Amino acid sequence: GGEQLGFAFDPEELGKWQDAMFAKIVTKCGNRRYWEDWAKDIAEIADRHQMRIRALLEKPYSKGKKAFDEFLKGVRKNLNPSVSQNDAIEMLAQHIITKPVFDALFEGYAFTSKNPVSQSMQKIMDILDAQALDKEHETLEGFYASVRERASGITDPKGRQKIIIELYDKFFKTAFPRMVERLGIVYTPVEIVDFILHSADAALQAHFGTRLADQNVHILDPFTGTGTFPVRLIETGLIPPEKLPYKYRHELHANEIVLLAYYIAAINIEEAFHRVTGLEYEPFPGIVLTDTFQMNEPQTGDLYEGLPENHKRSDEQKARDIRVIVGNPPYSVGQDNANDNNQNLKYPRLDGRIAATYAAHSTATNKNSLYDSYIRAFRWASDRIKDEGIVCFVTNGGWIDGNTMDGFRKTLQDEFADVYVFNLRGNQRTSGELSRKEGGKVFGSGSRTPVAITLLIKRKDHQGKAAIHYHDIGDYLSREQKLEIVSSFGSYQQVPWQTLEPNEYHDWINQRSGDFNAFVPLNDEPDAIFAFRSRGVETSR
């Protein structure tokens, strides 16, 4: 064995070499700090894009102004009548910045040129004088290059998902924080998604003798986010490969209200289908950019040119007989400050249904929380499946024992045949020992509320009240332990359910005793001690 040769490096040269190597590693692999720096630039550039678009719209009779007005009309029809001009400008700014990102992430898929919403927006941008907006492109070129570098060579779908979610997270939290706050955006852990999908499939078979894969079973995820539910439905094999093309083209439906999330969902679903079937790339026809809650509200006015193809998809979905609804509804419950111009929207028909059911049966004085997004989602889905079907959501679990929710709990019993509630706990609006007992938050830092998976089964032939099946995941469990338990059950059929007997007050757990009613009321006609009362603390009067 000869002597090993050494290398004589100049220390300064060695430093340069080390820096170059590190730069290459960062370029190829990316790191969180690096992406957050880009996000700050993106936020500023998005603002500048919005200012430029506003300036272009100040020419009242220009072609650009006419095209934008048409677009705004379309957005209001597809999303919500209360969408402002500023909201539409923000959407266009998002589109300008993200189009090249998707082109970089999914080279060879021609996604942005085939997606109906992307096409409509690109038409507006072409008219609005793209030159005026292209000045920022050079600044962003480095960012797009980093996305291309990071995505190149990643064929593993989980790796690509990770990049997309990181991008989405960083982009939203920094560039559009108000939107994150308004919509309560959080991601659904795959373990929970798989549990919900397998439970829906098992419940369909047990109660209706069909499966998710069967023809004429239409499946809808009304709040698809980045498309995790449809993607996992494609990936898990619940739909056999020979049945997948038909299901994908005709019976799988997804809605999303946030433009960027809609783009990501469409790409994710399309990529999953392409990968699993090995067929040519094919745009997913079942995804709609829309406000799900707005879909059943009365429509006014004529058809327009704003987003025609998207509107057509929305009409087609409304005509479908949807029997399975799964997903993770938005969590937003209002806002901290009434002046931040970010109020949650109103839906007269949907809210009227809540007033006639959940609120009508509630004994609470303040019923505002019955109009939280996730409660609206239950009302909307219960009505959408008509007289028969399945709803399975993961939501805030506060309704299980909240005082205001007594009317909601009563209505679930009245409208369904079976109600399954898997309480994952995690209420971090508690402290000390109680907080430790509640355990980890399954949504990570995305949510501090307790979380529950609820499976609702509605049958035409059912008489009487629903059977209530309940399972508490247990005390002192970490997030990872909870997800492991959910995963090990596989579906609702393996969960050791306990049957609950609600009392006359519609308490399901932690039932109150009747002793309290023996006390003399301070204010409760006609035997009250005091004749008048007001909500003084809330009204400051």
Task: For every predicted segment, state its role.
Residues 175-176, 297, 334-336, 430-432:
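Short acidic/His/Gly/Ser-rich catalytic and metal-binding motifs that mark active-site loops
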Residues 228-247, 251, 295-393, 398-405, ...:
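SAM-dependent methyltransferase catalytic-core segment centered on the flexible catalytic loop
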